[in-house]
């Protein structure tokens, strides 16, 4: 699933090319792509016609277009969703097609059909307007209003693994499996350590590292392990070449030379250095 940097790459592309444009045509090619819009495909199509796109937004992994009727079009990318501008060659996985008033084609392509579009109202949470489905999502480390000290306080009250908390979008959003492993490696913290047992200073360093690694990834177009994670022009990012932890099982740690390990965690894989990031000791009974 795309994480914050990959979603932000898409948002920036949309902001540049669709802001100020009016939607003049919409066609839903697969009903599953609008299953979150409870009123159905016909309602979504009718409500989008002749509506102007006033801007774009993102919180964590959530992406949306703001509209001039005070609604928002939430774009769920899911595992493989793509927002593409211009003509597309392969229409096998085209789920929704829209046309803008300058003739630009805006396509939602989704091979695995976990994503989709949803029209929703905006609500105000902590002084910020967000789509209603995003109201429960915490701010992410790249949000200008992100309160690191507040999140550290929340983490100090959590008696479960720190990696589990990094992945909890109600605690801090946007950090997925890849960037959690990268931030943990940068700070030499094992993801199995209990959040409440970590000093405030270390938790602050971890959140800073998450922001830094995602900023680094954003500068390289995000992380793309296959052709599914692309920008609005269909181009893949290349931060996967710079990963220090994720996907490096059996390779030497770039810092100390120890062999990187992989372990199962929450139906995912965790990658870490056993020397730089030793597992927490299990108390003897």
UniProtKB/Swiss-Prot annotation:
Effect of deleting the gene: Loss of excision of 8-oxoG from dsDNA. No significant growth in the presence of 3 mM H(2)O(2). 4-fold increase in mutation frequency upon plating on rifampicin (mutator phenotype); an increase in A to G and C to G mutations is seen.
Pfam families linked to this entry: Fapy_DNA_glyco, H2TH, zf-FPG_IleRS
Keywords: DNA damage, DNA repair, DNA-binding, Glycosidase, Hydrolase, Lyase, Metal-binding, Multifunctional enzyme, Zinc, Zinc-finger
Binding, DNA: 93, 112, 158
Keyword Acyltransferase: no
InterPro entries cross-referenced by the UniProt entry: DNA_glyclase/AP_lyase_DNA-bd (IPR015886), DNA_glyclase_Znf_dom_DNA_BS (IPR015887), Formamido-pyr_DNA_Glyclase (IPR020629), FPG_cat (IPR012319), MutM-like_N-ter (IPR035937), Ribosomal_uS13-like_H2TH (IPR010979), Znf_DNA_glyclase/AP_lyase (IPR000214), Znf_FPG/IleRS (IPR010663)
Annotated cofactor note: Binds 1 zinc ion per subunit.
E.C. numbers: 3.2.2.23, 4.2.99.18
Reactions performed catalytically: Hydrolysis of DNA containing ring-opened 7-methylguanine residues, releasing 2,6-diamino-4-hydroxy-5-(N-methyl)formamidopyrimidine; 2'-deoxyribonucleotide-(2'-deoxyribose 5'-phosphate)-2'-deoxyribonucleotide-DNA = a 3'-end 2'-deoxyribonucleotide-(2,3-dehydro-2,3-deoxyribose 5'-phosphate)-DNA + a 5'-end 5'-phospho-2'-deoxyribonucleoside-DNA + H(+)
Zinc finger (FPG-type): 244-278
The protein's required cofactors: Zn(2+)
Source organism superkingdom: Bacteria
Catalytic site positions: 2-3, 61, 268
GO biological process: base-excision repair
Any one Gene Ontology molecular-function term assigned to this protein's record: 8-oxo-7,8-dihydroguanine DNA N-glycosylase activity
PANTHER family: FORMAMIDOPYRIMIDINE-DNA GLYCOSYLASE (PTHR22993:SF9)
Membership in a protein family: Belongs to the FPG family.
Role noted for this protein: Involved in base excision repair of DNA damaged by oxidation or by mutagenic agents. Acts as a DNA glycosylase that recognizes and removes damaged bases. Acts on oxidized purines, such as 7,8-dihydro-8-oxoguanine (8-oxoG) when paired with C, G or T. Has AP (apurinic/apyrimidinic) lyase activity and introduces nicks in the DNA strand. Cleaves the DNA backbone by beta-delta elimination to generate a single-strand break at the site of the removed base with both 3'- and 5'-phosphates.
Subunit: Monomer.
NCBIfam families membership: fpg, PRK01103.1
HAMAP family assigned: Fapy_DNA_glycosyl (MF_00103)
Protein name as catalogued: Formamidopyrimidine-DNA glycosylase
């Amino acid at each position: 699933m795309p994480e914050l940097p990959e979603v932000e790459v898409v948002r920036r592309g949309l902001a540049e090319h669709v802001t100020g444009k009016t939607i003049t045509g919409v066609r839903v090619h697969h009903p599953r792509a609008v299953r979150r819009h409870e009123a159905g495909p016909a309602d979504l199509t009718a409500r989008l016609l002749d509506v102007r796109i006033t801007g774009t937004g993102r919180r964590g992994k959530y992406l949306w277009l703001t509209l001039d009727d005070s609604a928002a079009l939430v774009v769920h990318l899911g595992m493989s969703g793509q927002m593409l501008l211009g003509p597309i060659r392969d229409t096998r996985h085209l789920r929704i097609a829209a046309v803008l008033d300058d003739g630009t084609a805006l396509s939602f392509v989704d091979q695995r059909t976990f994503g989709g579009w949803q029209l929703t109202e905006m609500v105000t949470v902590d002084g910020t307007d967000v789509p209603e489905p995003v109201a429960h999502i915490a701010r992410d480390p790249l949000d200008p209003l992100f309160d690191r000290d507040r999140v550290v306080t929340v983490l100090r009250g959590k008696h479960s693994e720190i990696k589990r908390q990094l992945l909890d979008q109600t605690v801090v959003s946007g950090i997925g499996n890849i960037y959690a492993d990268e931030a943990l490696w940068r700070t030499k913290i094992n993801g199995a350590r209990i959040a409440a047992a970590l000093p405030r200073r270390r938790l602050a360093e971890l959140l800073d590292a998450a922001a830094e690694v995602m900023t680094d990834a954003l500068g390289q177009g995000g992380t793309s392990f296959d052709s599914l994670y692309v920008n609005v022009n269909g181009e893949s990012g290349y931060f996967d070449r710079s990963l220090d932890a994720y996907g490096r099982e059996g390779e030497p740690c770039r810092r100390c030379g120890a062999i990187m390990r992989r372990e199962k965690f929450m139906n995912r894989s965790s990658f870490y250095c056993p020397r730089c990031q030793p597992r927490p000791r299990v108390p003897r009974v």
